[in-house]
Amino acid sequence: MSKRDYYEVLGLSKGASTDEIKKAYRRLAKKYHPDVSKEENAIEKFKEVQEAYEVLSDDQKRAQYDQFGHAGANQGFGGFGGGGDFGGGFGFEDIFSSFFGGGGGRRRDPNAPRQGADLQYQVTLDFEEAIFGKELNVEIPVEDPCDTCKGSGAKPGTSKETCKHCSGSGQVSVEQNTPFGRIVNRQACGHCSGTGQIIKEKCTTCHGSGKVRKRKKINVKIPAGIDNGQQIRVSGKGEAGVNGGPAGDLYVVVHVRNHEFFEREGDHIICEMPLTFAQMALGDEVEVPTVHGKVKLKIPAGTQTGTEFRLKGKGAPNVRGYGQGDQYVVVRVVVPTKLTSQQKDLLREFAGQEEQDDSLFGKLKRAFKGE
């Protein structure tokens, strides 16, 4: 696929001035920036604009391009890297900052209330516990407000002071020279770490952080029907908020141990039931285990291995309360590894007959049951 003309990419004529090239580049880079643009091919267009600017903003590269086209532009310097810096030491982070950071944007109050961080806790349940639900008392490490300083971080009897370097704003102005001129950016004040306040005398308990590490016991109700990998949100049981903000949430991630007999698919429970050849061929009534207790299941004569039977309502309850799953029983014939002489003779007799009568089926059934 041939490359587009660099002037066309920037929407300029070949006689465009350096300032016109810079303005066109800034406008298009902002338009197609991947963090801002919602267009499907924004990344490709952004790279195309960046490549065009890299060539046309350099007098030597531009002269080669004007004379030889793309072949001349690619001679004497490496191909476009896509993720590197812009020409002239002006980086990707700088251009983004000049567009969306700086003095024109809304500044967040460093002392405004902020929600605390969310926490995650892993819990492992038995198969039946996940089916029927459970109530747990879990102990988690959290950061709570310091009782000594009431979360201020300052020694009792003292208070925080306004930072003189940023006048309490938590931000300072930094000037930067760029190809587009001098730009003023705002960044967090290094003296107060962006808080706008200085603690002269720190609390000896929390050392100025305003928080202490504790282990907190929390009651968690596991709903019936929860499945492996699902999580429960316990509102307000995460880390404490900042500056009086609300606490975060606790997310309890559930893991379910495998069962030796049952498997689970959504709200349904699957199991395999081993049966003898005689039971499959002649039919029988068997007891099938379920998580709700044993139930009777009728096996029709002539049932094939792999046949699936449904036990309605014997699965797991839906975790959101939308009904109950079923249990599916898959029957498998178990081929005996040791046969008596009588059993072998009867099987040979069975295999040699075109049509089997009831008397032969009766003999087979009694033989395999040891009667």
UniProtKB/Swiss-Prot annotation:
Q: Name one GO molecular function term.
A: heat shock protein binding
Zn finger (CR-type) ranges are: 133-215
Q: What is its main location?
A: cytoplasm
Where does it localize? Answer: Cytoplasm
Q: How is the cofactor bound?
A: Binds 2 Zn(2+) ions per monomer.
- Alphabetized Pfam families for the sequence: DnaJ, DnaJ_C, DnaJ_CXXCXGXG
Positions annotated as CXXCXGXG motif repeat: 146-153, 163-170, 189-196, 203-210
Instruction: Show the SUPFAM superfamilies listed in the entry.
Output: Chaperone J-domain, DnaJ/Hsp40 cysteine-rich domain, HSP40/DnaJ peptide-binding domain
Q: Where does Zn(2+) 1 bind?
A: C146, C149, C203, C206
Q: Where does Zn(2+) 2 bind?
A: C163, C166, C189, C192
Instruction: Return the InterPro entries for the record.
Output: DnaJ, DnaJ_C, DnaJ_domain, DnaJ_domain_CS, HSP40/DnaJ_pept-bd, HSP_DnaJ_Cys-rich_dom, HSP_DnaJ_Cys-rich_dom_sf, J_dom_sf
GO terms classed as biological process: chaperone cofactor-dependent protein refolding; DNA replication; protein refolding; response to heat
Keyword flag Acetylation: no
Amino-acid biosynthesis as a keyword?
no
**What residues does the J domain cover?**
5-69
Q: Which GO terms describe its cellular component?
A: cytoplasm
Domain notes, please?
Answer: The J domain is necessary and sufficient to stimulate DnaK ATPase activity. Zinc center 1 plays an important role in the autonomous, DnaK-independent chaperone activity of DnaJ. Zinc center 2 is essential for interaction with DnaK and for DnaJ activity.
Subunit structure, briefly?
A: Homodimer.
HAMAP family of this UniProt entry?
Answer: DnaJ
Q: What is this protein called?
A: Chaperone protein DnaJ
* Organism of this sequence: Bacillus cereus (strain B4264)
What lineage is on file?
Bacteria, Bacillati, Bacillota, Bacilli, Bacillales
